[in-house]
Each structure stands twice: as C-alpha cells, then as structure tokens.
C-alpha cells in the first residue's frame, strides 16, 4: 500500500472475504467491521446494513450469538426503513436471524421470521430459499 493511501470499503471487504475463506474469522470480522465503519461514516445505510449482517454472520460462525443478535436486528431495521432496500437483502438478513432465534428457543419469533423470509424468497422465485424456509416452518409447527 502506498504511503497515505487509505483502502476503500470494497477493498477492506475483499480482505475480509479472503480471511474468512482462509478460516481466520477474527481477521475477517475485523475487516468487515472496519468497512462497516466507513459506510456508517459516509451515511451509506444499505451498504452499512449489508456489511454488519456479514459481521453478525461471522459472530454466529464463532458461536457468539450475543454479539450477532443486535447486529442482525439493526441490519433488518435499516433494511425495513429504507425504500431502496433490495428484497433479497432483507430476506438474506431475516434467514440467519431466524436461525439464531430458533437455536435460542425463541420459536414464535423464529417462525414469524421464516414466514416473512419465505414470502420474500417466493416473490423473487428463489426456490432454494423457499424450500429452506418451508423446512424450518414445518419443523417448528411440529414442536
């Protein structure tokens, strides 16, 4: 890197992806968090929401639901409050939050999240997403 050069959020995310693929979750989380700060400082709400969702995913990989949960909640709230949100981004944020709630025994909330994600995936004809949601909804109905 050149002296005085500051990496862009996109470059930092690429570093995070590489670290995650290599199994260095702490470095990956750190890089995604650095990119999220850039997006937040620039008031790029949707990029920030997307990036903190990835930070939450990494926390989940590290079995740290306590850190993941508020990031998923913030990401979902930001997506829901922005008219430019892509439906797939919201669905992809609901999915891991549903998994987290299901694992924590918050079955009523998990069921609602799976239903909402299913509707969104269905509206986009993302069949793998619909099928996964259906599996979880069926499982939760049997409990």
Located regions from the model:
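Eukaryotic all-alpha helical interaction scaffolds
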Residues: 19, 39, 79-81, 101, ...
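Structural signature of alpha-solenoid helical repeat scaffolds
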Residues: 3-4, 43, 85, 125
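Alpha-helical segment of the N-proximal tetratricopeptide repeat
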Residues: 5-41
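Residue register of alpha-helical TPR repeats
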Residues: 10-11, 50, 89-92, 112, ...
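Residue signature of alpha-solenoid helical repeat architecture, marking inter-repeat boundaries
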Residues: 6-7, 46, 88, 128
């Amino acid at each position: 890197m050149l002296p005085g050069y500051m990496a862009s959020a996109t470059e930092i995310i690429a570093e995070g992806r590489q670290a995650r693929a290599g199994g260095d979750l702490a470095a990956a989380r750190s890089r995604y968090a650095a990119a999220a700060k850039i997006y937040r400082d620039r008031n790029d709400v949707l990029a920030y929401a997307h990036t903190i969702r990835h930070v939450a995913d990494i926390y989940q990989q590290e079995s740290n639901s306590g850190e993941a949960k508020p990031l998923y909640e913030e990401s979902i709230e930001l997506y829901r409050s922005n008219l430019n949100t892509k439906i797939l981004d919201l669905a992809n944020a609901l999915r891991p939050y549903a998994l987290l709630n299901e694992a924590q025994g918050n079955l009523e909330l998990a069921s609602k999240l799976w239903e909402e994600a299913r509707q969104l995936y269905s509206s986009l004809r993302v069949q793998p997403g619909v099928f996964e949601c259906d599996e979880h909804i069926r499982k939760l109905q049997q409990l």
